[in-house]
Amino acid sequence: MTAEIAEAASAFAHTGTSITAVNPPDGPASIQGPEDGNACLPGLFKLFDETLNDQAYDAVLIACFDDTGLFELKKRVSIPVIGIGEAAFHAATMLGRTFSTVTTLSASIPVIEDNIKAYGFADQSIRVRASEVPVLEVGQQTRKIIHYEARLACEEDKCDVVVLGCAGMAGLAQSLSAELERPVIDGVSAAMEFCQTLVRMRAA
């Protein structure tokens, strides 16, 4: 999945932007809920401290929608560190007054809801929905299930914006937006744009 996320991010890379995709060798294969998130932290922090620094990179994108370890990682470097959940919620509130999120498993809902509150978007968030599609199975083959849940978010929640709550859903946003006739945000593209914008602002 790391390679697929890197490919999705590359589609939003501006001229001169290069992407290095890394994944901790230890820890769970995917992050689905708080237990997986906690289990991955030692490997994530070790990888971050060993390979990422202010001189080597201009920005860091955390490609887990749970924004695992994000607040701690922001403290460790002076460059922008952006989580895809964080970026998606900010983008959603710029495009509409309300949003609903479609994620993978129900186990992730409490983490995402806590993050939404921490970012200050509790009033704009209507609901976090679970498609019950495991992270490693997300893709074009499960598109119908995710589309169904996204349509319910529009029809039942009456949200202005739909947020796709998994990095693996990045390739679905454009087509879903056209079908649902409203903005659909994936965190990978949102985080890429925010990272590049913040880097340019720092260089100005």
Question: PLM ranges: what are they?
Answer:
Residues 17-45, 136-139:
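N-terminal beta-loop-helix "entrance" segment that forms/cooperates
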Residues 57-64, 158-166:
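Periplasmic-binding protein-like
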